[in-house]
Amino acid sequence: MAITRKNLFGKLDATLFKGIESATTICKLRGNPYVELIHWLNQLWHQEDNDLKHIVRYFAVDVDAFERGLAQALARLPVGATSISDFSYHIELAIERAWVYASLECLDTRIRSGHLLLAMLTNMELRRALLAIAPEMEKIPLEHLSSDFNFITQASPETNEAATDGSPMYDGTLPGEASNAINGKSTATLAQYTTDLTALAREGKIDPVLGRNHEISTMVDILLRRRQNNPLLTGEAGVGKTAVVEGLALAIVAGEMPPALSQVSLLTLDVVALSAGASMKGEFEARLKNVLDEAMASPTPVILFIDEVHTLVGAGGNAGTGDAANLLKPALARGQLRTIGATTWSEFKRHIEKDPALTRRFQVLQVDEPDEDTAISMLRGLTPALEKHHGVWIMDEALQAAVRLSHRYIPARQLPDKAISLLDTACARVAVAQFSQPAELQQLTFQSETAQTELSSLEKAQHFGKGQDERTALLEATIAQHSAAANKLEQRWQAERELVTAITATRTVLYELVSQPTPDEEKRQQYQQQLAQLEEQLLLIRSAQPLVQAEVNATVIANIVADWTGIQVGQMLKDDIRAVMELPQRLEERVIGQPHALVQLSENIMTARAGMADPRKPLGVFMLVGPSGVGKTETALAIAESMYGGEQNLITINMSEYQESHTVSSLKGSPPGYVGYGEGGVLTEAVRRKPYSVVLLDEIEKAHSDVHELFFQVFDKGQMEDGEGRFIDFKNTILLLTSNVGSELLSNLFADPDTAPDQDGILSALQPELLKVFPAAFLGRVTVIPYLPLQQSALQHIVRLHLDRIGQRLQSQHQLTLQYSDVVVDDVVSRCSVAETGARMLIRYIEQNITPEIGKFILRDHDAIPNQIVFVDKVENKFTVSVLNEKINN
């Protein structure tokens, strides 16, 4: 009968066991694949005292030569292994021969390092291995050592040591297993490389999963098949593929599954752990095969969940060699192993779909991003866990704001993942604010310290006659101002903290009270009154910007989105109805001289927002027709800012780049087999990432007719199929198409304002011109809005607007106020021909003739006193810039 390792290693005394334990650690650190004799001898030699050292000293072995031999032997070992495969054959042989010598020759009950050395000198195979490491050991006479062993080692600490298996601390663990330097052989592969989701569900360690009943039911249908019973969950990162599997585990534990699935164990495979340390060819595949064999042989039915299943394709080696997916195929096809896979759609197309044999063994189950209502329900299921973790109260308005704002302003991620991250961050911010100083107070403290540092430097310079009295006085005033503001803010923060702490405690007591089967009504009313009083006190000491929040609300959510995106909080919290109602006013402020066009645009968008338009179509599809420079692009910018929170939500496509028919693929994405497949299209990817946006198709008349036809599905159904077969949703976008078709006709019609036609007449006159470029089917799907040539009053207004913008820059940069005469405005308008370039010529003229004069004035008189008036005038055909005598009072 073979001797077990447990019994063999248990006979080592404490010195030898510690030595081989540290030898396994050194072996792993050096990257050696096996624990060798050299590791053990090296560690024994570096111990403070033992039999080995007494024997070496007794026989006068050259210590320097012995240590050089150890170092050289270690250097000769192969390196590069990420884990230890096992103990070498020589280790086990040496222990076995040492035990024979100790028990039979020395009548001892444990193995000492001296016994180990005797065994290595006695056995010819071990002797060769020892002398290869340390040739100096040949000087030790075997007979002398054997006969005088007890005398030579009488002072060794090993004399009084017992065998390891005689210690109450010994549990049969092999050397290296306790420190994880070497993997134990007794651990089941299935338990080592998987996590039991059903066990976690029983222990309450999985959060509730809501809103995925359809996906779970479909997955159960697939799992109950006799063959090819393997669902493959595909969907964008963050839509909740893993949560669907966790929902299945919860349903199994809750007894909501049919009998065939009621007793199964749902195990998730850790692919990273499976591949970690698999340095030798075939080791990864061997581990995976052991997992599959144990799963199929398990007495309890097992369903294996492989997240990121595409990592198994090619994971075991290069393409065509040892592909781990090939190990899965037979078991999956025969139905012996039920497997749930999960991967993103792009990874599925890139890796799995290319292997038809693997693809047909899975049934693809698409997990789509939930709508806003479903996502809110999902967050409600997570609310108790978040409240318990952070110790805060989450209002329902915070859940709605997290979903709505993340859906609109964080388009790069998916619901519910981004809403959960947003809500989790909000909870953390509210919890932290109760213990750390607010950002405003920290900023004031920093500014005060910065000013104090500069003041100290100036005071030092003053001793050397280099003082700056004005700067010193300014810094002293700044420090005093910041200190006063910081003290005031500190007091308010402390007061808010105390009240919020009291409110939180009262809410906790009140919640525990009402949770009782028969709550005390009198106490409930008492605590409710106390809570109302505390909240009223908090409102009294607060300003518009609270320093400490008593709960997670919509304002906290909006502040975090503002930090992440840079969009103003007010614009995010503004509801859609108010944004639509303010749209006409916003457009009139930015787009000058187009009242009829703006009214028509506003009315159409209002109709769509009221739900009266076809819900399958985009919010609006408008073709803005007119000369260049009359406000078409500015209209798109104004709508993006008013309706979608900022100009960053404007997607601009220059259609002059799509004059050939083959350029259609760059808009929607290349089809399979073509260069660029899988990278997405310019338009489809932009809308997929920003579903709430204005899409500006500039100079649409220059695009190829095939490109025009591409948009028919967008105009009719509000969606476009990209090159990968995904449908991109355009229902929340506003499409603006700009065109210069009919510009000359419009200029002629409005050459004389008295004979200009009305709006219907303009459209009738434009129709023949448009039909020369666009087919009737295209024009029938868009709303044509003519943009008229700008009149004199509109041009003057535009000039004043641009000069006012220059004045704003002057005020912010130099604290100077800009004024200008009417002569300047009239001169700019009279000198610019706007027939072909529109308002762009006016702006270019101002930037070429007026702005340089202001710039030279600033550089020449750079020490001009702040708060003065800079006046621009036209004198003798030349623009002049001067300072008025009067000064603006703050």
Curated annotation (Swiss-Prot):
<keyword id="KW-0346">Stress response</keyword>
<comment type="subunit">
    <text>Homohexamer. The oligomerization is ATP-dependent.</text>
</comment>
<feature type="binding site">
    <location>
        <begin position="235"/>
        <end position="242"/>
    </location>
    <ligand>
        <name>ATP 1</name>
    </ligand>
</feature>
<keyword id="KW-0547">Nucleotide-binding</keyword>
<feature type="region of interest" description="NBD1">
    <location>
        <begin position="171"/>
        <end position="369"/>
    </location>
</feature>
<dbReference type="InterPro" id="IPR018368">
    <property type="entry name" value="ClpA/B_CS1"/>
</dbReference>
<feature type="coiled-coil region">
    <location>
        <begin position="420"/>
        <end position="544"/>
    </location>
</feature>
<dbReference type="InterPro" id="IPR001270">
    <property type="entry name" value="ClpA/B"/>
</dbReference>
<feature type="region of interest" description="Linker">
    <location>
        <begin position="370"/>
        <end position="566"/>
    </location>
</feature>
<feature type="region of interest" description="C-terminal">
    <location>
        <begin position="790"/>
        <end position="890"/>
    </location>
</feature>
<dbReference type="Pfam" id="PF00004">
    <property type="entry name" value="AAA"/>
</dbReference>
<dbReference type="InterPro" id="IPR027417">
    <property type="entry name" value="P-loop_NTPase"/>
</dbReference>
<dbReference type="InterPro" id="IPR004176">
    <property type="entry name" value="Clp_R_dom"/>
</dbReference>
<dbReference type="InterPro" id="IPR017729">
    <property type="entry name" value="ATPase_T6SS_ClpV1"/>
</dbReference>
<dbReference type="InterPro" id="IPR003959">
    <property type="entry name" value="ATPase_AAA_core"/>
</dbReference>
<keyword id="KW-0963">Cytoplasm</keyword>
<keyword id="KW-0067">ATP-binding</keyword>
<feature type="region of interest" description="NBD2">
    <location>
        <begin position="567"/>
        <end position="789"/>
    </location>
</feature>
<dbReference type="GO" id="GO:0005737">
    <property type="term" value="C:cytoplasm"/>
</dbReference>
<dbReference type="InterPro" id="IPR028299">
    <property type="entry name" value="ClpA/B_CS2"/>
</dbReference>
<dbReference type="Pfam" id="PF17871">
    <property type="entry name" value="AAA_lid_9"/>
</dbReference>
<keyword id="KW-0175">Coiled coil</keyword>
<dbReference type="Pfam" id="PF07724">
    <property type="entry name" value="AAA_2"/>
</dbReference>
<feature type="binding site">
    <location>
        <begin position="626"/>
        <end position="633"/>
    </location>
    <ligand>
        <name>ATP 2</name>
    </ligand>
</feature>
<dbReference type="InterPro" id="IPR050130">
    <property type="entry name" value="ClpA_ClpB"/>
</dbReference>
<comment type="similarity">
    <text>Belongs to the ClpA/ClpB family.</text>
</comment>
<dbReference type="InterPro" id="IPR019489">
    <property type="entry name" value="Clp_ATPase_C"/>
</dbReference>
<comment type="function">
    <text>Part of a stress-induced multi-chaperone system, it is involved in the recovery of the cell from heat-induced damage, in cooperation with DnaK, DnaJ and GrpE. Acts before DnaK, in the processing of protein aggregates. Protein binding stimulates the ATPase activity; ATP hydrolysis unfolds the denatured protein aggregates, which probably helps expose new hydrophobic binding sites on the surface of ClpB-bound aggregates, contributing to the solubilization and refolding of denatured protein aggregates by DnaK. Affects level of invasin and motility in Y.enterocolitica.</text>
</comment>
<keyword id="KW-0143">Chaperone</keyword>
<dbReference type="InterPro" id="IPR036628">
    <property type="entry name" value="Clp_N_dom_sf"/>
</dbReference>
<dbReference type="GO" id="GO:0016887">
    <property type="term" value="F:ATP hydrolysis activity"/>
</dbReference>
<feature type="domain" description="Clp R">
    <location>
        <begin position="9"/>
        <end position="150"/>
    </location>
</feature>
<protein>
    <recommendedName>
        <fullName>Chaperone protein ClpB</fullName>
    </recommendedName>
</protein>
<feature type="region of interest" description="Repeat 2">
    <location>
        <begin position="87"/>
        <end position="150"/>
    </location>
</feature>
<dbReference type="Pfam" id="PF10431">
    <property type="entry name" value="ClpB_D2-small"/>
</dbReference>
<dbReference type="InterPro" id="IPR003593">
    <property type="entry name" value="AAA+_ATPase"/>
</dbReference>
<dbReference type="GO" id="GO:0005524">
    <property type="term" value="F:ATP binding"/>
</dbReference>
<dbReference type="InterPro" id="IPR041546">
    <property type="entry name" value="ClpA/ClpB_AAA_lid"/>
</dbReference>
<keyword id="KW-0677">Repeat</keyword>
<feature type="region of interest" description="Repeat 1">
    <location>
        <begin position="12"/>
        <end position="77"/>
    </location>
</feature>
<dbReference type="GO" id="GO:0034605">
    <property type="term" value="P:cellular response to heat"/>
</dbReference>
